[in-house]
Amino acid sequence: VELLVVIAIIGVMVGLLLPAVQAAREAARRMSCSNNMKQLGLGLHNYHAAYNTFPAGVRGGSASEGWGFPFWYGLLPFIEQQALAERVVNVGGPAPGQHPGWLGILNAGGHANSAGTLNAAVCNNVVVTSFVCPSNPMEPNRNAAGSIVTFPSYIGIQGGVDDDAFGAAGVSPPMAGAAGDTDRFQNKRQRSNSACCGGTTSNGIQSAGGVLVGNEYLGFKHITDGTSNLIVLGEVGDWMKDPNQNLVDLRGIYGWPMGTSRAERITTWVDFAGGDARQFNLTSIRYPIGTRVTTLPGTGNDFGPNNPLVSAHTGGVQVTLADGSVRFMTNSTDLPLLKRLATRDSGTTKELP
């Protein structure tokens, strides 16, 4: 009887202690995630100190030049990944300190020695730990067009966008300034009506209101709202769910090396019908934090110009601000405020929750 009593007491103690242990472990993982995001923020600052600008959100070239890299490449030398940065094949003669030509991990053009093919080998099985939140339940490295590459738990923030009154299903939303355009950020965004990859991404809205935007180099001087009032990085480190409650990974399908195939700035792009508008590793804020619906316009697991911020942390996500600090923002954060915090020059009063 005494033995049974002891066993029962031990069982009760384990039941009481286990949640505390799990909470402590998650607190440690969240702290590690915060440190990662601080390192990335410091990397952005050091890049700016070296080149007087932040890296472009993504770079792209002509159809023959193929896919460029996202801003992650520019950060590599500043997050203890100098060796990887030096091994990446440089094509296209970019400006010093900026992205290495146009060819990312894909679009090798069918040539065995093209930069795309060579970089696929360079990036293969290289784990970039700073890109991964320890709380993220998804596989940190997985196959991307034949290479095993890191899929970041974090994403660059292009800006914030509002919705217009769309027309019939499948009809492109109005362009900036056109009839029917009610987007208050209309001077700093473009539509992503891409002929490629279909789905809800065809009603995506891409912004250029932040500092990590396509084919454009922006710096502190452009952040007129103040660096403590601009989000530059957010989390995408948890599963989404489709209408059947199946788990869906919305980190994109090509991992950290993938940028864009477009050479234009967002504000000069025309309607994308017949073109490929994809920009990987970036999102424009359109939906509340913690939104996990995969059927909303602009969301997708190939790429999603409006994929929402999500994390495995309870109640919200961590974000990196342009001043390098990291803040936790809850799922209940006011959406209009979140969009303004994604915009470098909104001219409005912002108060972080």
State where each predicted segment sits:
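N-terminal single-pass transmembrane signal-anchor helix
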Residues: 1-29, 33, 39
